[in-house]
Amino acid sequence: MLKPNMLIIIFIIVCLFSIIIFTVLKSKRGDDDESDDGFSCYNKPIGVNFPHPTRCDAFYMCVGLNQKLELICPEGFEFDPDVKNCVPISDYGCTANQN
């Protein structure tokens, strides 16, 4: 069993690591209340994928308070908002509807 002092040290390390990661992510993306494409993570759940407003092969994942990551599907795939993941391009999906 861990001693109380060891638990405090582990807690401090986890907190510092979290702060560093948050700072790095925030500096790479900047303040993110809304991007040029109009998508915002404001009042959206963290860890959920959302369709990109203009690209079939891209989606956003909200990763923090008003912070997002733009992710791209592999070649030959498109984002399906029903399953909230990348799926093979189909004759009835987003890509087909854009043509």
From Swiss-Prot:
Matches recorded under PROSITE patterns: CHIT_BIND_II
Location of the protein in the cell: Host nucleus; Virion
Top-level taxon of origin: Viruses
Residue ranges annotated for the Chitin-binding type-2 domain, each copy included: 38-96
Species lineage: Viruses, Viruses incertae sedis, Naldaviricetes, Lefavirales, Baculoviridae
Gene3D superfamilies the UniProt entry points to: Chitin binding domain
Listed name of the protein: Protein AC150
SMART domains named in the record: ChtBD2
